[in-house]
From Swiss-Prot:
Residues 60-64 are annotated as: G2. GTP binds at residues 19-26, 81-85, 136-139. GTP hydrolase that promotes the GTP-dependent binding of aminoacyl-tRNA to the A-site of ribosomes during protein biosynthesis. It is found in: Cytoplasm. Signal peptide: none annotated. This is Elongation factor Tu. Belongs to the TRAFAC class translation factor GTPase superfamily. Classic translation factor GTPase family. EF-Tu/EF-1A subfamily.
């Protein structure tokens, strides 16, 4: 029989488990793979396989992340699980493994704990579109009313961080019991199916990069005699066609308008370039010295230049190659935002703290010396003297 070819018929989505340490995130991840393996939608991945998370590098930061995959009738999922609390923070801030939706795991025995709060806050800051809740370890709580209280507490927490806490699906179960059950029709395994039904129906389909408005960070600029100026870069999102109107944004508040008169890839002329392509765009009526690395080429009106913003930042420890000493307000490092490398000042820390230690994560206000194309949810690196000292995500634009 001919080998079956991979058909991309289902929507692909990135999800993950979040929540306090020892509340059962990894056990639940294993239980999902086991439950779906009965239906042929996954290979069962045991707990200790997931717990040995391999190291990954993102923006110079080492993060331990486990990836498993599984599918339901509706979607194909890539699921991430991190062994340590610090790994979650680093992952969410750097966007190393992006989440289109997250499963918040809360132990019925404990209720909402400090990391539960921190993960929900981070999910809000980095714009995770939707959460569902799994109240775990309900087999260890005899009084149903206690579980009701935990559910109310979780819904209140979600509301306080602007998630729709009253409508978020909350499923009660036991990941460990589901793993021990070995029966696709068992009551605990049914709870896992119930959770996956909620994930299928409640998480909205992610917007693909190619369907978003066109944006390309400018890496290099060339002048071609008789033809004009070419800017090169990797298209971050959307599609660009020959003849499209675009804007050149950043480095000043003035936005230049131009038309793409040609798109080239590997020295061949194309009709269009799309997200992920490394291309050169020929621009009408633009001189070589009017464009700089660090600006972006974008669909008109889709992004604007800004200097001042709030960001959630993870400060690297010295073992990660970061600073050995804390820094205070007024610190002026370099901010690497897409292809721009711009000096900025830390105006203030939201917590009212006076200084930040290596290994901390903190929300801060930053003011750049000149404007760059900025939007909420955008990632950046902070560097000083040639080394990365922090990684951040824009949470709010001020001006």
């Amino acid at each position: 029989m001919a080998k079956e070819k991979f058909v991309r018929a289902k929507t692909h989505m990135n999800v993950g488990t979040i929540g306090h340490i020892d509340h059962g995130k990894t056990t639940l991840t294993a239980a999902i793979t086991k439950a779906l393996s009965y239906k042929g939608g996954a290979d069962f991945t045991p707990f200790d396989m997931i717990d040995k998370a391999p190291e990954e590098k993102a923006r110079g930061i080492t993060i331990n992340v486990s990836h498993v995959e599984y599918q339901t009738d509706k979607r194909h999922y890539a699921h991430i699980d991190c062994p340590g609390h610090a790994d979650y923070i680093k992952n969410m801030i750097t966007g190393a493994a992006q989440m289109d939706g997250a499963i918040l795991v809360v132990a019925a025995t404990d209720g909402v704990m400090p990391q539960t709060r921190e993960h929900v806050l981070l999910a809000r800051q980095v714009n995770v579109p939707a959460l569902v809740v799994f109240i775990n370890k309900v087999d260890m709580v005899d009084d149903e009313e206690l579980i009701d209280l935990v559910e109310m507490e979780v819904r209140d927490l979600l509301n306080s961080y602007e998630f729709p806490g009253d409508e978020v699906p909350v499923i009660r179960g036991s990941a460990l019991k589901a793993l021990e059950e070995d029966n696709p029709d068992g009551p605990w395994t049914q709870k896992i199916y119930e959770l996956m039904d909620a994930v299928d129906s409640y998480f909205p389909d992610p917007v693909r990069e190619i369907d978003k408005p066109f944006l390309m960070p400018i890496e290099d600029i060339f002048s071609i005699t008789g033809r004009g100026t070419v800017v090169t870069g990797r298209i971050e999102r959307g599609v660009v066609h020959t003849g499209d109107q675009v804007e050149i944004i950043g480095l000043s508040y003035e936005t230049k308008k131009t038309v793409v008169t040609g798109v080239e890839m590997f020295r061949k002329i194309l009709d269009e370039g799309e997200a992920g392509d490394n291309v050169g765009c020929l621009l009408r009526g633009i001189e070589k010295d009017e464009v700089k690395r660090g600006q972006v080429l974008a669909a008109p009106g889709s992004i604007t230049p800004h200097k001042k913003f709030k960001a959630e930042v993870y400060v690297l420890k010295k073992e990660e190659g970061g600073r050995h000493t804390p820094f205070t307000k007024g610190y002026r490092p370099q901010f690497y935002i897409r292809t721009a490398d711009v000096t900025g000042t830390l105006v203030e820390f939201s917590s009212g703290a006076e200084m930040v230690m290596p290994g901390d994560n903190i929300n801060m206000t930053v003011e750049l010396i000149y404007p760059v194309a900025l939007e909420e949810g955008m990632r950046f690196a902070i560097r000083e003297g040639g080394r990365t000292v922090g990684a951040g995500v824009v949470t709010e634009i001020i001006e």
